[in-house]
């Protein structure tokens, strides 16, 4: 028999001869994706489960790192020469763009995990040539190793850049732990860089997005879709920065402060730029945007398009940005790369060249810079900063600190000697524990009082879940600590059933008051702790009533925040548009219900099995918002049984959609109505992976495992914001 001569036969897939087979999502693109629940696990982390980054950072000689960063700033490299002999502008841009992906709607993005190292962020058009900044930092990262993460180092480099150019920063906190794989986020619907299919109606930006185009951090510097209209650009700026948790004053300070330093790069034809880092040749070793214009670097650098230097002293802090903005009239022009920008009319050449000390240029601005003059609200702030440079410096220092620390969560997570003493409202402050904590005997007595208070299992579980499940692992906000569920805006959220919530809180506050008044020696219990304890007591009772004795772990130490410590507008972003665990869906939700469930589970840092067991347990405990019976597939509400899974998976029930978008489950033989459910419920029988998980808990021998797994997942959510326990 002749040997096969087909050239494709036997080729090794790692040498280019193989082809990637179709994945499941290629065949079924609408399939619910659970992969997001299992990313950044210990399997992808080379540091090992015992690695404690906080302890490593505490042992770091931070001053030595800062000294090395200072030296780096003026150590110009031939392979990527520094503009004006100083890498400060480049490092500020790197830090800014690392932090600037943050969005308040879901708390995702930001600098907290060093994601700029990975695709797609490392190859976004707006991040062009920041690969060079990170390579500049590599010798320092290599020197200090595990003691400082990439995430911390990138932000610290931006801070040191500012300090090295004469600006006094507000402070710096370490504590950002690196991840080791890219985060799969929804950055927009577009399939091309700089696409803008994210708008509807009168330029209504889709949620949860903040940037105006795919691959941009903020707005298009040439104006909306390249239209050089400063007033129209101001609308984009305001919306984008608001979605990044910045008000108008912070926005003006950040734009003007950042543009006091460095320059943009548009020296030539952008078509001469090579592939981004992810698309570059293997021999380029992760460096992208190789340019065929002149030398490709230095004076020939092409990054975005505009060729703008804002200040006469681009390596020193000054007020030149505002002095130039208001001191000249501006005329529209184009950069050598063909991008819209503005130059000062009838101006002398007072701005230095980045690489030739014999050259000078007239001041230039971006369309989005002029927005700070021609938008009436921004203009008032800008003139105040022009006339009061000290106010400008303070506003920029505070806004920069907020920008670079917004996604780190509460102050208890901050590390290092440079942490500011001042506590800021956007840090969601919670008082430090100021009393003796309850002991096991106290806890047992309080549980008995709670269960004898007349509150039902459903009411106690619902309240504890509502309090704790606001936690977002993305920006470390929310959670049960602080008991903000009793404060505006959370006490009035529809999903929290305000009338029922008020009743539960009133009775728990009475128990709290009676207990605290009877104590000596400074012992107390906070309402935050009591809310969680009530939920734990209810879960124990529900399990006991279902035939399983279990102790739900409870660790006191939460405190109660005040209304004055709570930024109402900021906390509105945490209001659930959907909570599949409570079968709640508002009219403002922008995902399919089952997608929203997975999204919330990911924010809670739950795995697919944890999501499954929690939902099934909460259904039979009667924790649905509004008392809805949808998905309550049991005749024993309030008992922690596996009935949800048993009744969902039985073939005795046939499900049919009805007009309101929900489903009826009828007996196959008699057509008798047995249950009502939503897509969030039925997905656990329809989705093959979720059905496999549901089957585990529907088995005849699974009741005890179901209870134990539910308790473990419940405890994880109750303690999600207990950074003091980590």
From Swiss-Prot:
**Per the record, what are the reactions this protein catalyses?**
H2O2 + AH2 = A + 2 H2O; 2 H2O2 = O2 + 2 H2O
Positions marked as site (Transition state stabilizer): 93
- Record location of the Tryptophyl-tyrosyl-methioninium (Trp-Tyr) (with M-244) cross-link: 96-218
Its Gene Ontology cellular component terms are:
cytosol
Write down the CDD domains for this protein, in alphabetical order.
catalase_peroxidase_1, catalase_peroxidase_2
Q: Name one GO molecular function term.
A: heme binding
Give me the ranges of the annotated region Disordered. 1-25
Cofactor(s) the record lists: heme b
Q: Which GO terms describe its biological process?
A: cellular response to hydrogen peroxide; hydrogen peroxide catabolic process
* Leader sequence segment: none
Under NCBIfam families, the record lists:
cat_per_HPI, PRK15061.1
The record describes its quaternary structure and partners as: Homodimer or homotetramer.
Could you identify this protein by its name? Catalase-peroxidase
Q: Tell me the classification of the organism that encodes this protein.
A: Bacteria, Pseudomonadati, Pseudomonadota, Alphaproteobacteria, Hyphomicrobiales
The gene for this chain is katG
């Amino acid at each position: 028999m002749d040997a096969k001569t087909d050239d494709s036969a036997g080729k090794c897939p790692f040498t280019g001869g193989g082809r990637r087979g179709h994945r499941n999502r290629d065949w079924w693109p609408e399939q619910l994706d659970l992969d997001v629940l299992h990313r950044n696990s210990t399997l992808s982390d080379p540091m090992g489960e015992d690695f404690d980054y906080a302890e490593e950072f505490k042992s770091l000689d931070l001053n030595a790192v800062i000294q090395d960063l200072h030296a780096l700033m003026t150590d110009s490299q031939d392979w990527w020469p520094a503009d004006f002999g100083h890498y400060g502008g480049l490092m500020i841009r790197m830090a800014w763009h690392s932090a600037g992906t943050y969005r308040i709607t879901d708390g995702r993005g930001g600098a907290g995990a060093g994601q700029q190292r990975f695709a797609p962020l490392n190859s976004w058009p707006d991040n062009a040539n920041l690969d060079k900044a990170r390579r500049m930092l590599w010798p320092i990262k290599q020197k200090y190793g595990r003691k400082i993460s990439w995430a911390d180092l990138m932000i610290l480099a931006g801070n040191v850049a500012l300090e090295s150019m004469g600006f006094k920063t507000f402070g710096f906190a370490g504590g950002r732990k690196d991840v080791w794989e890219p985060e799969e986020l929804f950055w927009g619907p577009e399939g091309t860089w700089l696409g803008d299919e994210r708008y509807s109606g009168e330029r209504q930006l889709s949620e949860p997005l903040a940037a105006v185009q795919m691959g941009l951090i903020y707005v298009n510097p040439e104006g909306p879709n390249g239209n050089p209209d400063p007033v129209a650009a101001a609308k984009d700026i305001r919306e984008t920065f608001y979605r990044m948790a910045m008000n108008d004053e912070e926005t003006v300070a950040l734009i003007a402060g950042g543009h006091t330093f460095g320059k943009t790069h548009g020296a030539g034809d952008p078509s001469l730029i090579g592939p981004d880092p992810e698309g570059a040749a293997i021999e380029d070793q992760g460096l992208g945007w190789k340019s065929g214009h002149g030398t490709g670097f230095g004076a020939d650098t092409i990054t975005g398009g505009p060729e703008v230097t804002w200040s006469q002293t681009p390596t020193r802090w000054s007020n030149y940005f505002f002095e130039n903005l208001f001191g000249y009239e501006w005329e529209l022009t184009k950069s050598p790369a063909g991008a819209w920008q503005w130059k000062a009319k009838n101006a002398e050449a007072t701005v230095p060249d980045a690489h030739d000390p014999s050259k000078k240029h007239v001041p230039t601005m971006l369309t989005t810079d002029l927005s700070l003059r021609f938008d009436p609200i921004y203009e008032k702030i800008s003139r105040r900063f022009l006339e009061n440079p000290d106010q400008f410096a303070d506003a920029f220092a505070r806004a920069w600190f907020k920008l670079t620390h917004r996604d780190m969560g509460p102050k208890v997570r901050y590390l290092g000697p440079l942490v500011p003493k001042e506590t800021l409202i956007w840090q969601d402050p919670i008082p430090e524990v100021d009393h003796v904590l309850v002991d096991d005997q106290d806890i047992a007595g309080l549980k008995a009082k709670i269960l004898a208070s007349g509150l039902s299992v459903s009411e106690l579980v619902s309240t504890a879940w509502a309090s704790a499940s606001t936690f977002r692992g993305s920006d470390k906000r929310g959670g049960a600590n602080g008991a903000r569920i009793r404060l505006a805006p959370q006490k009035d959220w529809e999903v929290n059933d305000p009338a029922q919530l008020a009743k539960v809180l009133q009775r728990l506050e009475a128990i709290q008051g009676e207990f605290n008044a009877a104590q000596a020696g400074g012992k107390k219990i906070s309402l935050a702790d009591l809310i969680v304890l009530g939920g734990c007591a209810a879960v124990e009772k529900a399990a006991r009533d279902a035939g399983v004795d279990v102790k739900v772990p409870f660790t006191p130490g939460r405190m109660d925040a005040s209304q004055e410590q709570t930024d109402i507008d900021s906390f509105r972003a945490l209001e659930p548009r959907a909570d599949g665990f409570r079968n709640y869906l508002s009219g403002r939700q922008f995902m399919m219900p089952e997608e929203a469930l997975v999204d919330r589970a990911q924010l809670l840092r739950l795995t697919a099995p944890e999501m499954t067991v929690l939902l099934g347990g909460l259904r039979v405990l009667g924790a649905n918002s509004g008392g809805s019976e949808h998905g309550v597939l049991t005749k024993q509400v309030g008992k922690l049984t596996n009935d949800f899974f048993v009744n969902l998976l039985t073939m005795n029930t046939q499900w049919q959609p009805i007009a309101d978008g929900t489903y009826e489950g009828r007996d196959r033989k008699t057509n008798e109505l047995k249950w009502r459910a939503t897509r969030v419920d039925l997905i656990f029988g329809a989705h093959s992976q979720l059905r496999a998980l549901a089957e585990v808990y529907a088995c005849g021998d699974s009741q005890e495992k179901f209870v134990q797994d539910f308790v473990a997942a419940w405890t994880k959510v109750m303690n999600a914001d207990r950074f003091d326990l980590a």
